[in-house]
Design a protein with these regions (language model features):
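Large intracellular
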Residues: 2-199, 306-315
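Transmembrane alpha-helical segments and their cytosolic interface motifs
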Residues: 54-68, 196-230, 265, 269
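Perimembrane helix-loop junctions in membrane proteins
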Residues: 82-83, 117-131, 232-242, 283-290
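Membrane-interfacial helix-loop-helix connectors in multipass membrane proteins
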Residues: 84-94, 233-258
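Hydrophobic alpha-helical transmembrane segments of multi-pass membrane proteins
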Residues: 98-111, 213-216, 220-223, 261-265
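Hydrophobic alpha-helical membrane-associated segments
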Residues: 106-113, 224-228, 273, 277-284
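Channel- or pocket-lining gating/hinge segments that regulate access to a cavity or pore
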Residues: 189, 193, 208, 242-315
Length: 315
């Protein structure tokens, strides 16, 4: 991150570590606009989630549309390329009549999870851009006090439209606003620590729904397997009742059982593959957010968390 250059004058008092210019902050100098650049605000259908949390209803609407498109494509592939055994096997796993009660919910949950994770990834990338803003003075001679805090706050508001919607800038704004109110640093460290815990809980809770989908999708697959087994065994039982010991009829009944097993295990395969892709995407995003958090912790400590570092700057 480049050293901060402050575009602000504070009366006749120069703030250590900041350079004064003749250009006051204004709406035209915004570097990031949450209301225009956040992916959910660009779509504009639903209220944007906090920080990196996606709007669940938006993800569900996208999932319904994607599920409809997916099954339409599968039906087309089956009708146009049924002679291809691979295409036929793939298509039937989804659109076989006995599988639909399982595959439709499983695919819907899959696209819901993937939509939420995609939106979350875009929001995380947008939040990370705040780290590149020249909002924080990093000169070694900078002294944090009530006067300099006001200048930094004005600088932050000149760079973004809504600092409270940025994970990093919201914490900084809260810290400096309290510093301006109480006129000291010692109590700010406690506020920062509480805010940091709230932010971490907010980020962690954004994975709760998709984590639930990771286990619920395979459960749907197992339900489909049980249904297939049940229907096959029931058909075989009826065959035994009417066969009268006829081996040919018994063999035919066993064939129905094996077909039921094949149908049942198709749903499990579909569900496990869906859950695998969801889990891989979750791990990918968690790694990205971990990198973001690491960079976040490496920003100036006097504005973030560590009370000893903060107090050492008080004069």
């Amino acid at each position: 991150m480049e050293p901060n250059v402050m575009a602000e004058q504070h009366g006749n008092t120069s703030v250590p570590g900041l350079r004064n210019t003749d250009q006051p902050p204004g709406p035209t100098s915004l570097s990031l606009s949450w209301s225009e650049e956040d992916i959910e605000n660009r779509i504009g259908l639903f209220k944007a989630g906090r920080y990196t949390s996606p709007n669940k209803l938006l993800g569900f609407v996208a999932a319904v549309l994607l599920t409809g498109v997916f099954f339409a494509v599968v039906v087309y592939l089956y009708s146009a390329f049924a002679s291809n055994p691979l295409v036929e096997r793939f298509s039937l796993a989804f659109i076989r009549t006995k599988n639909l009660s399982t595959t439709i919910p499983a695919v819907l949950l899959f696209f819901w999870a993937m939509s939420l994770l995609y939106i979350k990834g875009q929001k995380t990338h947008f939040q990370a851009r705040a780290l590149d803003l020249a909002a924080l003075p990093q000169q070694p001679d900078f002294v944090l006090n009530e006067s300099s805090a006001k200048v930094v706050l004005e600088r932050i508001h000149s760079l973004v439209d809504h600092p409270r919607h940025f994970l990093l800038l919201n914490r900084i704004e809260r810290a400096l606003s309290n510093l301006h109110n109480i006129g000291g640093i010692s109590e700010v460290s406690t506020i920062l620590k509480d805010q940091a815990e709230n932010d971490e809980n907010q980020v962690a809770s954004s994975y709760m729904l998709v984590n639930g989908m990771v286990w619920s999708v395979p459960v749907l697959g197992f339900i489909g397997t049980v249904q297939g087994l049940g229907s096959g065994i029931a058909a075989f039982g009826k065959t035994l009742e009417v066969s009268g010991g006829d081996l040919d009829k018994i063999k035919q009944g066993l064939l129905g059982v094996t077909n039921g097993l094949a149908t049942g295990f198709e749903t499990t395969l579909v569900a496990l593959v869906c859950a695998l892709f969801i889990q891989l995407y979750i791990h990918y995003l968690q790694q990205k957010e971990m990198e973001f958090s690491t960079t976040f912790r490496n920003t100036p400590q006097w504005l973030l968390l560590t009370p000893p570092d903060v107090n050492s700057l008080q004069k």
